[in-house]
């Protein structure tokens, strides 16, 4: 399993951002094999974690047309900067 970590410094968010973010989450979960998605924001920082079975699914998601457009909008309007990290999950356990 893999996790994609998206960390951003927010410039300004608007109503379109909320719509686009909800659509991207829906697409990732329903059509591209994203297993789980969590996002939090505090002040001008945003962090999103998405979990995936394989890197092929991540690459397909990254190259999808709607997602590419959302990335362009993010760079142009919503984010000052961002970092994307892809990591392999070595161990996963929970309680209870």
Q: Language-model segments: which ranges?
A:
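Residues that form generic nucleotide/phosphate-binding pockets
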Residues: 27, 70-73
